[in-house]
Amino acid sequence: MIKLIVGLGNPGAEYTATRHNAGFWLVDQLAREAGTTLRDERRFHGFYAKARLHGEEVHLLEPQTYMNRSGQSVVAVAQFFKILPDEILVAHDELDLPPGSIKLKLGGGSGGHNGLKDITAHLSSQQYWRLRIGIGHPRDLIPESARAGAKPDVANYVLKPPRREEQDVIDASIERGLAVMPQIIKGELERAMMQLHRNP
């Protein structure tokens, strides 16, 4: 069963619409669905709410520590409520998936994502669930003829808002993620994965 759902992003109005904040977008939607408001909770270093979703009590969290220190916030909630790593779902932006794609997985490396890297370090475990929201990679914007030797600026890319057509398909992928939340929260993660991965 999933007891804690974390959305990753950076705090501050200047980052709200950026690709790196896709995890926040999903958790914001969940809070709206639950009719609750995330509030600044100092002891958890983030915006936090206890919500009732699909008949279960779930903790929602958006770390306000900046991305590369997200683990500090996640571990604070996990320790306080005695939540195990495999009862945690982290929603985050994923460079290795195209916009419009969304995938669910348990464990694995960080794929260069500093938020995941810090969460893994703080939990001393990779065995937490990830909901990977595709944002595409800046190399995909470089014409193939010019790709050899080109160094895409990943840091700049994730801190910029998606183009309109990308935003539309990212929003649609988040809706698909929300559609499988009943299974995810109840612990039917294999079923959720099959349903989610039937779509691109």
Curated annotation (Swiss-Prot):
The active site is at H20. One of its GO terms (biological process) is rescue of stalled ribosome. One of its GO terms (molecular function) is tRNA binding. It catalyses: an N-acyl-L-alpha-aminoacyl-tRNA + H2O = an N-acyl-L-amino acid + a tRNA + H(+). The keyword Transferase does not apply. Hydrolyzes ribosome-free peptidyl-tRNAs (with 1 or more amino acids incorporated), which drop off the ribosome during protein synthesis, or as a result of ribosome stalling. This is Peptidyl-tRNA hydrolase. It comes from Paraburkholderia phytofirmans (strain DSM 17436 / LMG 22146 / PsJN) (Burkholderia phytofirmans). The lineage of its organism: Bacteria, Pseudomonadati, Pseudomonadota, Betaproteobacteria, Burkholderiales. The gene is pth.
